């Protein structure tokens, strides 16, 4: 038995093959915890974005309803103005001009 070899009598405990099972469990646990945190963070971000989108959608819906009501009111005003315009035009240019009484005498 030769003790002057360059290899140590016991293998290096830092190599992956010689690490303890508790190290692997701890490392796996840290990885799982990290992934769980990432998943929760992503889920919170997605929920926040979803709420923001719903709020934006609601605001746009309310604004759209307001525009529709305003449009209907303007249509009614335009129709009334059109009728008034027709009435005034009829007064200005009657279909049958009255016969002048001076011509009949």
Swiss-Prot record:
Query: What domain of life does the UniProt record list for this protein's source?
Result: Eukaryota
Q: Which residues does UniProt call coiled coil?
A: 39-60
What induces or represses this gene?
Answer: Up-regulated in response to increased HD-ZIPIII activity. Up-regulated by REV.
Keywords attached to this entry: Coiled coil, Transcription, Transcription regulation
Location of the region described as Disordered in the Swiss-Prot/TrEMBL record: 1-20
- What's its job? Competitive inhibitor of the HD-ZIPIII transcription factors in shoot apical meristem (SAM) development. Acts by forming non-functional heterodimers. Part of a negative feedback loop. Essential for proper functioning of stem cells in the SAM.
- PANTHER family named in the record: PROTEIN LITTLE ZIPPER 2 (PTHR33601:SF18), PROTEIN LITTLE ZIPPER 4 (PTHR33601)
Q: Quaternary structure?
A: Interacts with REV.
The protein in question is named: Protein LITTLE ZIPPER 2
Organism listed in the record: Arabidopsis thaliana (Mouse-ear cress)
Its taxonomic placement starts with: Eukaryota, Viridiplantae, Streptophyta, Embryophyta, Tracheophyta
